């Protein structure tokens, strides 16, 4: 997923990473893509290191290679290498599996990468891939259950704090700030 502008490019809504991307790679950052080659077993993360302009605003950030390694991905390439990677796979007759996109930016990207008609992408999505993701995500191991419990507890604390702190005349954003501070 990429950031989405509210009224111009650099004034964005709060970023929310795609849940399936988070499930498989655990990296909550915009402008990333990944490929899992089921024939070779390779996992490839596509993303760019921050620029000096980014560092001025955000401070030093881990390199993409380090983020990939933390996610268990050994191969990391710049985002603009994705197009050549997909093109090479298509040229040797490999089937490209993808999940149904729900954001327009991703639909446009799929159109550019695969030539998939935007209006037909839902039906062109890989049923095999969808079923595989569902099979993985429907059963939880003890680690996943512990993470769900932790998230539920944080949500409880956030909402309970908001209820305790709410006062007449208070601006909603003040409560949102308190809740975000807990998260």
Where would I find each of the regions flagged by the language model?
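Active-site cores enriched in adjacent His and Asp/Glu residues with nearby glycine-rich loops
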Residues: 1-7, 149-183
